[in-house]
Amino acid sequence: MMELDTGLVVLLALILGLLVGSFLNVVIYRVPEGLNRNWKLQAKQMLDLPLEQGEGERFNILMPPSHCPSCKAAIKPWQNIPILSYVLLKGQCKHCHAAISLRYPLVELLTGLVFAVCAWKFGATWTALSAMVFSAYLIAMIFIDADTQLLPDQLTLPLMWGGIVFHLAAYLL
């Protein structure tokens, strides 16, 4: 089997981490928002209250497409390039010039660095990949918890079961 250069593995892990960090920003914003929307919707249905316009619309990790929270302008794919787009846009929405939180590039950078450290420590192995997945979950949960004091079951339960399965596989193999 061909051995990969450590520097290349670390660089690829850094790039992957930046991309995953960009996705984690979506998770950090949308998972708690989706929970709140579902709770309100369920409460209104239980109380037989009328729904306001747009309340029943689909909202999840993928829908609606990314947009500026201030002016609701759609974000183009090039505006989602981790860190680089933040620098090119000077930390502002292209349309309304509202400030973009510094947390977005920080989450991307943190995730990229953590992935790079995992690759440096474990190399191109399944252990590195599982450490990256575990780290991505933890980063998302840290920021969600900091914002809302919630740890959503959508994140904690897969992490728990994944940890159990990974440990059993390592133990049995």
What is each stretch, according to the model?
Residues 1-173:
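A membrane-topology feature that recognizes alpha-helical transmembrane segments
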